[in-house]
Structure formats: structure tokens, C-alpha cells
Amino acid sequence: FIVITVGHRGGTPMRGKAYHTYGYGNQRDYPLADDKYAIEQLAQRYSFIDIKRVGIYGHSGGGFMSASAICTYPDFYSAAVSSAGNHDNRIYNKGWVEIHFGVDERIKTVKDSLGVEHKTYTYSVRTRPNQDLVKNYKHGLLLFTGAMDQTVNPAHTLRLASALIKAKKDFGMYVLPESTHGFFGKSEEFFEHEMWRHFS
């Protein structure tokens, strides 16, 4: 295996505000494009990289991204492992930042009964859930969730699985019965074994 990590646009405040806040309002699509472009550049530079066998994995927010990646670029990624992914940020914990990245503020000017103008504000989450992407998905996705995950409720993974089933898509899924958000002990060993097997 060749394993890389990509630093996405918006990943550090050290390069200025415009760079750091690049992803506000869309936390998913631009990092996927960054990953794909970086892999394509590396494959062009190094002939030993097989661009026809590209996989992606991630946990938590990374699980959200790996499932998004194989659904967004189904002809580029041949395998993905998504563990404990927050696939639907509409049901994510309110205290975690991901739910706020895609908040859309709408300002409307209205007149009251005396003709005085006032502004009203409404807010909505605009990051689409991964379920909306399954129509593009072709093959190669393996999902994991901890049955006792207190950080990213298993409902995230179950909603994605339900959408995949309804769309008649082929995928794999494991629910680790004794796992919370992190996988430890025998559950971690099982997860790692199945992930390596999936990518081999």
C-alpha cells in the first residue's frame, strides 16, 4: 500500500483568513476535489502508483468524507472504508462544529403594520447528507459503526445503509457491538483486519 494524507484548503489559520475559512458553507466537496487532484498529481509524477486502484478510509469526520468520496468519484475510487461517519449532519450533536459549517443565513426585509422595515433571519443546514449521493455510488464501500457510539450516533451509518439498500446498491457493513466512537481491543483488531482485507 501507498498511504498519503492531504492537507486541504482551509486546513490551517497560518496561511491567512481567506485560506482558513475557505470551506465555510461547504465542508465536503472541496476537500474531495483536493484529494483527487493530489493523487492524480502523485501518480503522474511516480510511475509505481497504480491510479486504477485507489482507496480511501476515514473515521468520524473522515468516515463522512470517505463515503462521500466513493459516491462523488465512483470511477476514481475502487474501495472505501468509512467508520463512525457523521453521514447526516442534520442529526449530529449540536456541540460539534461540523453541524455549523454548512449553516445558511437568510435575511429577509419585511414591513410591519406601520410600514417600518425590519430584517428577519432564518437559518438552515445546507450540507447535504451522504444519503443524497448514493445514486452515484457503484461499488467498494465498507461501513463500520460502534453500537454504543455516544459521539456519532449509529443512526448516521444506518441512514446511509438504508439509502444504499433502497437504491439497490452493493456494500458491506459491520456494527461493532461493544464499541463506542473509538474502536479498542478485539474490536479494533477486527476492524483493522477487515479494513486491510477490503483494500487488498
Describe the residue ranges of each PLM region.
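Active-site-proximal cap/loop segments of hydrolase catalytic domains
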Residues: 5-200
